[in-house]
Curated annotation (Swiss-Prot):
Gene3D superfamilies in the record: MFS general substrate transporter like domains
Annotated family: Belongs to the sodium:galactoside symporter (TC 2.A.2) family.
Name of the protein this chain belongs to: Uncharacterized 29.9 kDa protein in crtE 3'region
Single GO cellular component term: plasma membrane
Matching InterPro entries: MFS_2, MFS_trans_sf
Lineage: Bacteria, Pseudomonadati, Pseudomonadota, Gammaproteobacteria, Enterobacterales
Length: 272
């Protein structure tokens, strides 16, 4: 998000000096709307086809790849540069993150064969949250941070994969309770919340660093700025992961409930 914020500040300054550049802003807005509609249509169709979670996850990752590069990797670069003291460790952290995401998708698929997916989501969210917060207190050593990053990324990706399974369950529940599928509405709502979360996270990062006295490109940062940089990369994601676990108390579509719903749908089809 830091990289994205810096680029946006340059854009705002350019718009102030050259009003005609506003045309590019309008074009960007229409492009974003078109991109959102495309993602909604594609993923909505995949849900109607009952595509496997791995396909949904891969489609989502490809659709959000530019935002991922501009936000998470930017934050990781600042964390590595100022906390570990050398940007050369960035590739190690990035490799651990990418391998963790691949392992998380495989882990979720294997666990859902024998365990309740809602419980697995909760366990992974809690473990990811606790380990992410523990990362704040971990020794400043690449030999500790890289393995922890791999484990945390694995757990986060497992929850992401399970989220798509749960979204498909919501679509099936909507069809059972309302008599029609609402895949487009479900995904477009999710996408809108996702975009809102990305916007708020970028704003929170900028406000926090501004409050902490962060100075861009400075060889050293103040103690408060350093703590904020590390907290934004560790504690904040951990707390949000724990908050995601807390919301499961309102999610009632466990495996047993979905079996009953699918059975009722099959009986309706047979009678019809």
């Amino acid at each position: 998000m830091l990289t994205m914020n810096n680029l946006l500040m340059v854009l705002v300054q350019a718009l102030r000096q050259h009003r005609w550049l506003c045309l590019f802003g309008v074009a960007y807005i229409f492009s974003s709307v078109g991109n959102g509609l495309t993602q909604t249509l594609i993923l909505g169709q995949l849900l109607r086809w009952h595509a496997p979670p791995s396909t949904l996850t891969l489609t989502y990752m490809l659709a959000t790849l530019p935002g991922f590069i501009g936000s998470y990797l930017g934050a990781m670069m600042y964390f590595v540069t100022y906390y570990l003291g050398s940007a050369s460790y960035f590739m190690w952290m990035l490799a651990a993150h990418i391998l963790g995401k691949a392992a998380g998708s495989l882990l979720a698929k294997r666990l859902t064969r024998n365990f309740n997916k809602v419980q697995i989501f909760g366990y992974c969210a809690v473990l990811a949250g606790v380990l992410s917060i523990a990362l704040f207190f971990a020794p400043k050593s690449v030999f500790v941070l890289v393995p922890l990053t791999f484990i945390i990324s694995t757990l986060y990706q497992a929850t992401t994969t399970l989220m798509w399974v749960m979204m498909a369950d919501v679509a099936d529940y909507g069809e059972w309770s309302q008599g029609k599928r609402m895949d487009g509405i479900i995904f477009s709502t999710f996408l809108a919340v996702l975009k809102l979360g990305m916007a708020l996270s970028g704003a929170i990062v900028g406000w926090t660093l501004g409050f902490s006295g962060y100075v861009a490109n400075a060889p050293e940062q103040t103690s408060l700025a350093m703590h904020c940089i590390v907290a934004l990369f560790t504690v904040v994601p951990g707390l949000l992961s724990l908050a995601a676990f807390a919301t499961l108390r309102w999610y009632k579509l466990d495996d047993q409930t979905m079996q009953e719903i699918n059975l009722a749908k099959m009986q309706t089809i047979v009678k019809g």
